[in-house]
Amino acid sequence: MSSSERLIYMSQPGVSIDWQYQAAEYYCQAIRGLKSAINTPAFDADPADHTSQSSVVSAAIAILSTYDLMDAPSMGWKPHLSALPLFSPASNPMAIPCSPVAVPQSIVEGPVFWSLARLDFLCASISETQTRLNLDDIPLWRNAGLAADENGVLLPFSPTGSGDIRASTGIQEDTRSNELIWLLGKIVNYLTSGDAINPEEFALPPGERFPLGVPQEQLLERWKILDTELQKWYDSLPTTFQASARTRRHDVASANADLNGFEQIWYELPICAATMQSYHMACVLLLVNKPQESTAIRTTLSARFRYYRQVQHQVLWHAREICGISLASPPDPVRVHSVLPLYVAGQVFHEPHEQRVVLVLLSAIETELGWATRYHVKKLTDEWQEEEHPLRSRLNVN
Protein backbone atom coordinates (compact mmCIF):
# COMPACT_ATOMS: atom_id res chain seq x y z
CA MET A 1 0.00 0.00 0.00
CA SER A 2 1.43 3.39 -1.00
CA SER A 3 1.67 6.31 1.43
CA SER A 4 -1.22 8.13 -0.25
CA GLU A 5 -3.41 5.00 -0.18
CA ARG A 6 -2.57 4.51 3.48
CA LEU A 7 -3.57 8.09 4.33
CA ILE A 8 -6.90 7.65 2.51
CA TYR A 9 -7.56 4.42 4.39
CA MET A 10 -6.65 5.94 7.77
CA SER A 11 -8.96 8.90 7.19
CA GLN A 12 -12.03 6.70 6.80
CA PRO A 13 -14.61 6.78 9.63
CA GLY A 14 -14.43 3.90 12.07
CA VAL A 15 -10.79 3.07 11.38
CA SER A 16 -8.88 2.59 14.62
CA ILE A 17 -5.31 3.88 14.38
CA ASP A 18 -2.39 3.04 16.64
CA TRP A 19 -0.57 6.36 16.41
CA GLN A 20 2.34 5.14 18.51
CA TYR A 21 2.94 2.33 16.04
CA GLN A 22 2.61 4.72 13.09
CA ALA A 23 5.14 7.11 14.62
CA ALA A 24 7.62 4.30 15.27
CA GLU A 25 7.20 3.02 11.71
CA TYR A 26 7.86 6.41 10.14
CA TYR A 27 10.84 6.92 12.45
CA CYS A 28 12.35 3.63 11.25
CA GLN A 29 11.72 4.65 7.64
CA ALA A 30 13.54 7.93 8.26
CA ILE A 31 16.52 6.09 9.77
CA ARG A 32 16.68 3.78 6.75
CA GLY A 33 16.51 6.80 4.47
CA LEU A 34 19.40 8.43 6.33
CA LYS A 35 21.55 5.33 6.03
CA SER A 36 20.83 5.17 2.31
CA ALA A 37 21.60 8.88 1.84
CA ILE A 38 24.90 8.67 3.70
CA ASN A 39 26.07 5.78 1.53
CA THR A 40 25.57 7.74 -1.70
CA PRO A 41 28.73 9.09 -3.42
CA ALA A 42 27.38 12.66 -3.44
CA PHE A 43 26.99 12.84 0.33
CA ASP A 44 30.16 14.87 0.95
CA ALA A 45 30.35 16.53 -2.45
CA ASP A 46 30.12 20.09 -1.13
CA PRO A 47 29.57 20.26 2.65
CA ALA A 48 29.82 24.07 2.62
CA ASP A 49 26.81 24.29 0.30
CA HIS A 50 23.73 24.70 2.51
CA THR A 51 21.58 23.00 -0.13
CA SER A 52 23.91 20.02 -0.47
CA GLN A 53 22.89 16.56 0.62
CA SER A 54 25.32 16.74 3.54
CA SER A 55 23.58 19.79 5.01
CA VAL A 56 20.14 18.27 4.46
CA VAL A 57 21.19 15.06 6.21
CA SER A 58 22.65 17.04 9.12
CA ALA A 59 19.36 18.89 9.50
CA ALA A 60 17.50 15.58 9.41
CA ILE A 61 19.71 14.24 12.19
CA ALA A 62 18.91 17.28 14.35
CA ILE A 63 15.18 16.76 13.79
CA LEU A 64 15.29 13.01 14.44
CA SER A 65 17.43 13.48 17.55
CA THR A 66 14.86 15.92 18.92
CA TYR A 67 12.07 13.51 18.05
CA ASP A 68 13.95 10.70 19.78
CA LEU A 69 14.55 12.76 22.91
CA MET A 70 10.86 13.67 23.19
CA ASP A 71 10.12 10.22 24.60
CA ALA A 72 13.45 9.30 26.19
CA PRO A 73 12.42 9.19 29.85
CA SER A 74 15.75 8.35 31.46
CA MET A 75 19.31 7.62 30.40
CA GLY A 76 18.08 6.92 26.89
CA TRP A 77 19.47 10.42 26.29
CA LYS A 78 23.02 9.12 26.45
CA PRO A 79 23.56 7.42 23.08
CA HIS A 80 21.32 9.54 20.88
CA LEU A 81 23.84 12.12 19.75
CA SER A 82 26.76 9.88 18.81
CA ALA A 83 25.93 10.74 15.21
CA LEU A 84 26.67 14.42 15.70
CA PRO A 85 28.50 15.95 12.74
CA LEU A 86 31.94 17.20 13.75
CA PHE A 87 32.02 14.58 16.50
CA SER A 88 34.90 12.14 16.30
CA PRO A 89 34.65 9.10 18.59
CA ALA A 90 38.42 8.98 18.80
CA SER A 91 38.45 12.43 20.42
CA ASN A 92 36.17 11.28 23.24
CA PRO A 93 36.85 7.77 24.53
CA MET A 94 33.90 8.01 26.93
CA ALA A 95 31.39 8.36 24.09
CA ILE A 96 29.02 5.50 23.36
CA PRO A 97 28.80 4.94 19.58
CA CYS A 98 25.44 3.17 19.44
CA SER A 99 23.56 5.56 17.18
CA PRO A 100 21.80 3.89 14.25
CA VAL A 101 23.47 6.35 11.86
CA ALA A 102 27.18 7.26 11.76
CA VAL A 103 27.70 10.58 10.03
CA PRO A 104 31.10 11.60 8.62
CA GLN A 105 32.60 14.84 9.82
CA SER A 106 31.50 17.82 7.77
CA ILE A 107 31.01 21.55 8.00
CA VAL A 108 27.68 22.40 9.62
CA GLU A 109 26.71 26.02 10.09
CA GLY A 110 23.87 28.19 11.24
CA PRO A 111 20.66 26.94 12.89
CA VAL A 112 21.47 23.27 12.26
CA PHE A 113 24.76 23.54 14.14
CA TRP A 114 23.20 25.35 17.09
CA SER A 115 20.35 22.85 17.25
CA LEU A 116 22.90 20.06 17.47
CA ALA A 117 24.93 22.00 20.04
CA ARG A 118 21.85 22.48 22.23
CA LEU A 119 21.04 18.76 22.01
CA ASP A 120 24.64 17.95 22.86
CA PHE A 121 24.45 20.12 25.99
CA LEU A 122 21.15 18.56 27.07
CA CYS A 123 22.51 15.05 26.61
CA ALA A 124 25.69 15.87 28.56
CA SER A 125 23.66 17.44 31.39
CA ILE A 126 21.27 14.53 31.81
CA SER A 127 23.92 11.80 31.48
CA GLU A 128 26.50 13.81 33.50
CA THR A 129 29.22 13.45 30.88
CA GLN A 130 31.42 15.78 28.86
CA THR A 131 29.95 17.39 25.76
CA ARG A 132 30.75 15.66 22.50
CA LEU A 133 31.47 18.88 20.63
CA ASN A 134 34.87 20.38 21.42
CA LEU A 135 34.17 23.72 23.11
CA ASP A 136 37.83 24.72 22.86
CA ASP A 137 37.82 24.49 19.06
CA ILE A 138 37.21 28.23 18.66
CA PRO A 139 37.46 28.26 14.82
CA LEU A 140 34.66 25.69 14.72
CA TRP A 141 32.38 27.83 16.88
CA ARG A 142 33.31 31.07 15.15
CA ASN A 143 32.51 29.43 11.83
CA ALA A 144 29.04 28.67 13.25
CA GLY A 145 28.53 32.32 14.20
CA LEU A 146 29.96 32.65 17.72
CA ALA A 147 31.21 36.22 18.18
CA ALA A 148 34.49 35.51 19.97
CA ASP A 149 38.15 36.28 19.47
CA GLU A 150 40.80 33.65 18.84
CA ASN A 151 41.12 33.07 22.61
CA GLY A 152 37.42 32.36 23.06
CA VAL A 153 36.54 35.70 24.65
CA LEU A 154 33.05 36.83 23.67
CA LEU A 155 32.99 40.08 21.71
CA PRO A 156 30.46 42.92 21.89
CA PHE A 157 27.74 42.34 19.32
CA SER A 158 27.26 44.85 16.51
CA PRO A 159 24.75 44.13 13.71
CA THR A 160 26.38 44.33 10.30
CA GLY A 161 24.89 46.51 7.61
CA SER A 162 21.27 46.57 8.77
CA GLY A 163 19.47 49.84 9.34
CA ASP A 164 16.26 48.05 10.34
CA ILE A 165 16.22 47.90 14.13
CA ARG A 166 13.71 45.05 14.04
CA ALA A 167 16.03 42.94 11.90
CA SER A 168 19.06 43.71 14.05
CA THR A 169 17.10 42.94 17.20
CA GLY A 170 16.23 39.48 15.90
CA ILE A 171 19.89 38.83 15.13
CA GLN A 172 20.93 39.94 18.61
CA GLU A 173 18.49 37.61 20.34
CA ASP A 174 19.64 34.60 18.33
CA THR A 175 23.30 35.46 18.82
CA ARG A 176 23.02 35.95 22.57
CA SER A 177 21.02 32.76 22.98
CA ASN A 178 23.61 30.79 21.03
CA GLU A 179 26.41 32.27 23.12
CA LEU A 180 24.70 30.99 26.25
CA ILE A 181 24.57 27.46 24.80
CA TRP A 182 28.34 27.60 24.41
CA LEU A 183 28.78 28.89 27.98
CA LEU A 184 26.42 26.23 29.35
CA GLY A 185 28.50 23.58 27.63
CA LYS A 186 31.62 24.92 29.35
CA ILE A 187 29.82 24.88 32.70
CA VAL A 188 28.63 21.29 32.36
CA ASN A 189 32.13 20.20 31.29
CA TYR A 190 33.55 21.92 34.38
CA LEU A 191 31.06 20.15 36.64
CA THR A 192 31.48 16.71 35.07
CA SER A 193 35.29 16.85 35.11
CA GLY A 194 35.42 17.14 38.91
CA ASP A 195 38.98 17.45 40.15
CA ALA A 196 40.36 14.97 37.61
CA ILE A 197 43.44 16.05 35.69
CA ASN A 198 41.97 14.40 32.59
CA PRO A 199 38.22 15.29 32.52
CA GLU A 200 37.21 11.87 31.16
CA GLU A 201 38.74 10.13 34.19
CA PHE A 202 36.10 11.55 36.54
CA ALA A 203 33.46 9.41 34.81
CA LEU A 204 35.32 6.26 35.86
CA PRO A 205 34.44 4.36 39.07
CA PRO A 206 36.25 5.79 42.14
CA GLY A 207 38.70 2.89 42.36
CA GLU A 208 39.84 3.35 38.75
CA ARG A 209 40.54 7.08 38.87
CA PHE A 210 44.03 8.53 39.01
CA PRO A 211 44.74 9.22 42.70
CA LEU A 212 46.03 12.76 42.15
CA GLY A 213 43.67 15.58 41.20
CA VAL A 214 43.61 19.28 40.38
CA PRO A 215 44.42 21.49 43.41
CA GLN A 216 41.49 23.26 45.06
CA GLU A 217 42.90 26.69 44.24
CA GLN A 218 43.10 25.81 40.54
CA LEU A 219 39.50 24.58 40.54
CA LEU A 220 38.46 27.85 42.13
CA GLU A 221 40.29 29.82 39.44
CA ARG A 222 38.47 27.88 36.72
CA TRP A 223 35.18 28.59 38.49
CA LYS A 224 35.95 32.32 38.66
CA ILE A 225 36.68 32.41 34.92
CA LEU A 226 33.31 30.80 34.14
CA ASP A 227 31.51 33.08 36.58
CA THR A 228 33.13 36.15 35.00
CA GLU A 229 32.25 34.99 31.48
CA LEU A 230 28.61 34.44 32.45
CA GLN A 231 28.42 37.85 34.13
CA LYS A 232 29.93 39.60 31.11
CA TRP A 233 27.42 37.84 28.87
CA TYR A 234 24.56 39.00 31.09
CA ASP A 235 25.84 42.58 31.25
CA SER A 236 25.98 42.77 27.44
CA LEU A 237 22.35 41.72 26.87
CA PRO A 238 20.03 44.11 24.99
CA THR A 239 16.95 45.47 26.71
CA THR A 240 14.72 42.83 25.10
CA PHE A 241 16.07 40.36 27.65
CA GLN A 242 14.56 42.40 30.47
CA ALA A 243 11.14 41.27 31.68
CA SER A 244 8.36 43.39 30.18
CA ALA A 245 6.04 42.81 33.15
CA ARG A 246 5.78 41.05 36.49
CA THR A 247 2.40 40.08 37.90
CA ARG A 248 1.15 37.98 40.79
CA ARG A 249 -1.50 35.31 40.70
CA HIS A 250 -4.46 35.55 43.06
CA ASP A 251 -6.26 32.23 42.81
CA VAL A 252 -8.69 31.54 45.62
CA ALA A 253 -9.14 27.91 44.60
CA SER A 254 -7.26 25.60 46.94
CA ALA A 255 -5.88 23.65 43.97
CA ASN A 256 -4.04 26.75 42.76
CA ALA A 257 -3.08 28.20 46.13
CA ASP A 258 0.53 27.05 45.72
CA LEU A 259 0.94 29.43 42.77
CA ASN A 260 0.05 32.55 44.74
CA GLY A 261 3.55 32.93 46.12
CA PHE A 262 5.12 33.13 42.66
CA GLU A 263 5.38 36.00 40.20
CA GLN A 264 4.47 35.62 36.56
CA ILE A 265 7.40 36.98 34.54
CA TRP A 266 6.59 38.10 31.00
CA TYR A 267 8.89 38.69 28.02
CA GLU A 268 7.99 40.21 24.67
CA LEU A 269 10.01 37.66 22.70
CA PRO A 270 9.77 33.91 23.39
CA ILE A 271 13.47 33.39 22.70
CA CYS A 272 14.30 35.83 25.51
CA ALA A 273 12.07 33.95 27.96
CA ALA A 274 13.72 30.62 27.13
CA THR A 275 17.22 32.11 27.23
CA MET A 276 16.69 33.74 30.61
CA GLN A 277 15.44 30.48 32.09
CA SER A 278 18.67 28.87 30.92
CA TYR A 279 20.65 31.78 32.37
CA HIS A 280 19.06 31.36 35.81
CA MET A 281 19.80 27.63 35.60
CA ALA A 282 23.45 28.40 34.80
CA CYS A 283 23.65 30.69 37.83
CA VAL A 284 22.28 27.97 40.10
CA LEU A 285 24.75 25.40 38.77
CA LEU A 286 27.69 27.73 39.31
CA LEU A 287 26.63 28.97 42.75
CA VAL A 288 26.13 25.53 44.28
CA ASN A 289 29.34 24.17 42.75
CA LYS A 290 31.77 26.90 43.78
CA PRO A 291 34.91 25.29 45.25
CA GLN A 292 35.84 26.29 48.78
CA GLU A 293 38.98 28.19 49.60
CA SER A 294 41.82 26.03 50.84
CA THR A 295 41.13 24.63 54.32
CA ALA A 296 44.49 26.07 55.30
CA ILE A 297 42.92 29.54 55.08
CA ARG A 298 41.32 30.08 58.47
CA THR A 299 37.87 31.60 58.69
CA THR A 300 35.27 31.77 61.40
CA LEU A 301 32.32 29.41 61.42
CA SER A 302 30.04 32.45 61.42
CA ALA A 303 31.57 33.72 58.18
CA ARG A 304 31.30 30.29 56.56
CA PHE A 305 27.64 29.87 57.54
CA ARG A 306 26.88 33.42 56.44
CA TYR A 307 28.25 32.52 53.02
CA TYR A 308 26.11 29.38 52.88
CA ARG A 309 22.99 31.40 53.69
CA GLN A 310 23.83 33.91 50.96
CA VAL A 311 24.21 31.13 48.40
CA GLN A 312 20.93 29.57 49.48
CA HIS A 313 19.15 32.91 49.15
CA GLN A 314 20.60 33.50 45.67
CA VAL A 315 19.80 30.05 44.27
CA LEU A 316 16.25 30.23 45.63
CA TRP A 317 15.77 33.55 43.82
CA HIS A 318 17.05 32.11 40.53
CA ALA A 319 14.84 29.02 40.94
CA ARG A 320 11.77 31.19 41.52
CA GLU A 321 12.63 33.23 38.42
CA ILE A 322 12.66 30.01 36.38
CA CYS A 323 9.20 29.09 37.66
CA GLY A 324 7.91 32.63 37.20
CA ILE A 325 8.75 32.55 33.50
CA SER A 326 6.97 29.22 33.09
CA LEU A 327 3.91 30.54 34.94
CA ALA A 328 3.49 33.40 32.44
CA SER A 329 1.92 31.12 29.81
CA PRO A 330 4.89 31.04 27.40
CA PRO A 331 4.43 29.43 23.95
CA ASP A 332 5.06 25.73 23.50
CA PRO A 333 8.71 25.95 22.29
CA VAL A 334 9.64 27.84 25.46
CA ARG A 335 7.92 25.20 27.58
CA VAL A 336 9.91 22.44 25.88
CA HIS A 337 13.17 24.25 26.60
CA SER A 338 12.09 24.80 30.22
CA VAL A 339 12.25 21.12 31.23
CA LEU A 340 15.88 21.12 32.38
CA PRO A 341 15.71 24.55 34.10
CA LEU A 342 12.56 23.44 35.96
CA TYR A 343 14.29 20.23 36.99
CA VAL A 344 17.20 22.23 38.41
CA ALA A 345 14.78 24.59 40.18
CA GLY A 346 13.03 21.59 41.71
CA GLN A 347 16.32 20.41 43.18
CA VAL A 348 16.71 23.79 44.87
CA PHE A 349 13.28 23.98 46.52
CA HIS A 350 12.67 22.42 49.93
CA GLU A 351 9.22 23.84 50.75
CA PRO A 352 6.38 21.47 49.73
CA HIS A 353 4.29 24.18 48.06
CA GLU A 354 7.26 25.20 45.88
CA GLN A 355 7.97 21.60 44.97
CA ARG A 356 4.33 21.06 43.98
CA VAL A 357 4.50 24.00 41.58
CA VAL A 358 7.47 22.43 39.78
CA LEU A 359 5.65 19.10 39.51
CA VAL A 360 2.56 20.82 38.08
CA LEU A 361 4.62 22.65 35.46
CA LEU A 362 6.62 19.57 34.43
CA SER A 363 3.61 17.25 34.33
CA ALA A 364 1.65 19.72 32.19
CA ILE A 365 4.43 19.74 29.60
CA GLU A 366 4.13 15.99 29.08
CA THR A 367 0.33 15.98 29.25
CA GLU A 368 -0.21 18.89 26.88
CA LEU A 369 2.82 18.71 24.57
CA GLY A 370 3.85 15.05 24.67
CA TRP A 371 7.43 15.87 25.70
CA ALA A 372 8.48 13.27 28.28
CA THR A 373 9.06 14.72 31.77
CA ARG A 374 8.16 11.72 33.94
CA TYR A 375 11.84 10.87 34.41
CA HIS A 376 12.50 14.31 35.88
CA VAL A 377 9.35 14.13 38.02
CA LYS A 378 10.35 10.76 39.46
CA LYS A 379 13.91 11.87 40.13
CA LEU A 380 12.68 14.94 42.00
CA THR A 381 10.11 13.09 44.08
CA ASP A 382 12.68 10.45 45.03
CA GLU A 383 15.17 13.13 46.09
CA TRP A 384 12.55 15.01 48.09
CA GLN A 385 11.49 11.85 49.93
CA GLU A 386 15.10 11.13 50.82
CA GLU A 387 15.53 14.69 52.06
CA GLU A 388 12.34 14.43 54.12
CA HIS A 389 13.58 11.32 55.91
CA PRO A 390 17.39 11.55 55.69
CA LEU A 391 18.07 9.49 58.81
CA ARG A 392 15.69 6.72 57.76
CA SER A 393 17.23 6.70 54.32
CA ARG A 394 20.77 6.41 55.66
CA LEU A 395 19.81 3.64 58.08
CA ASN A 396 17.58 1.93 55.50
CA VAL A 397 14.68 1.89 57.96
CA ASN A 398 11.12 1.54 56.64
Which residues does each predicted region cover?
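Intrinsically disordered, low-complexity regulatory regions with latent secondary structure
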Residues: K232, T247-R248, W266, V348-N398
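Residue position in alpha-helical solenoids
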Residues: G33, T40, F87-A90, W233-S236, ...
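Surface-exposed intrinsically disordered loops and tails
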Residues: S2-I8
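Amphipathic alpha-helical/coiled-coil segments positioned at domain termini
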Residues: H337-P341
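Cytosolic regulatory protein-protein interaction regions
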Residues: M10-V15, P156-P333, A345-R356
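Eukaryote-specific, cytoplasm-facing alpha-helical/coiled-coil scaffolding segments in long proteins
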Residues: L86-P93, L140-N151, A203-L212, S254-L259, ...
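Intrinsically disordered, low-complexity acidic/Ser/Thr-rich segments used as protein-protein interaction/activation
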Residues: Y9-W182, F210-V214, Q218, R249-P270
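Alpha-solenoid helical repeat scaffolds
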Residues: S3, Y67-M70, L119, I126, ...
